[in-house]
Amino acid sequence: MNFIKKIFAAVIAAATSFGMLLPTSSAANRNYPSTVMHKLEVYSKDSGGTLIFSDSPEYVRRNGILYTDTVEGDARLLFYHLNDTGVHKRFAIIFENTSKTKTVINITRGGLSAPNRNYFSVGKITQTMYMENDFTDRITLDRYERKVYEPYENYFLLKPGQLIHGVCDFVSNNPVRVFLMMYPEHADPLEFLSRAEILPKDEYRLRGTFKQMNRTLTLKKPYDGERDGLGYILIGDNINDLFKHGIDATDGSEVINYGNYGINYTLNFRTKFLTSFFLSPLGGHYAGALRYKYYGTSGVIQTPDNRLYFGDRTPPENAAVALARSEGISLMTEGTELSELGDYRGYVSFEYSPPGASNLPVNIVLMPTESK
């Protein structure tokens, strides 16, 4: 730890030689005691049903099955694919009842963007819709029946270079097999499925089935701005917040969900005094949304709320800064970008999930606004 402190002292000295350390947001106009941030300790617990994640191949160059697996009970489906051909293609979600009895699938929430070549727009629209939590649907399947699920007409037709991205939570009373597929524009999807091949994953291997699709992070002790100064928790760094491991059901191989896409986080905070909360991207471009819950009120906050994305102005971390951050010390510098999440005192929680097309990790930053 002394080694980390020595490195960080050098980092601070180098940063201050360039002038005052101020973040690029309205928070820059606030007074706070230090630009050094300290990691806040959290309890972490995973729970919930099964995530089916389909993002490989991300750039789809031929027709076929992108991913498939069988689930029962609570589940979440997340897909992210781009038509990387020179012709129109269709994307399909197909549910198959694998049981001898009638099966009902209740979709409890979802988010879907119309296909687009603007990846950040697609990711932000999808996550905003998911966080607004006002989409429900119901699918009924007879014994061994297959059915194409297409909730929005023409949302599943992709022009060359367009991206489709969606997420939905559902509950099934019997085992159902889910197929994600790219197929010719004018083909019959069920007929094509009967002869379609499973496409090989790309080098990033971002597809698979992951148990316990939800994660709860809870502060170990209430945040006291007078005592703690600037504080933060890290999400998606694979050191403080570990990536989920799962299985690619198409070949049985173990896979890692780099970024924890499709994992739904509940972030629980308790503060002693009025505290400002911010989201700060550390990995690059970022465009998303989250939901806050505060003493009977709730709402969706886009991150950022004043433009499509941010994080592009944050300079890359050098090795010393990244190492110090992983050990619990970080700087709020002139290049730090912040998206305001609101001011809260007492108990507040946020529902968060890494948005498609965006980069991890992120900091949730806590800044004192009063001391008593």
Task: Enumerate the predicted regions with their spans.
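Short beta-strand and strand-turn-strand segments in soluble, beta-rich domains
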Residues: Y119-T136
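Sec-dependent signal peptide cleavage junction
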Residues: M20-A28
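Exposed low-complexity, polar/acidic, P/S/T/G-rich flexible segments that act as propeptides
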Residues: I105, N173-K220, S358-K372
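Long compositionally biased, domain-poor regions of proteins
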Residues: R62-T108, S113, D134-R138, R146-V178, ...
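Bacterial N-terminal signal peptides that target proteins for export
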Residues: M1-V11
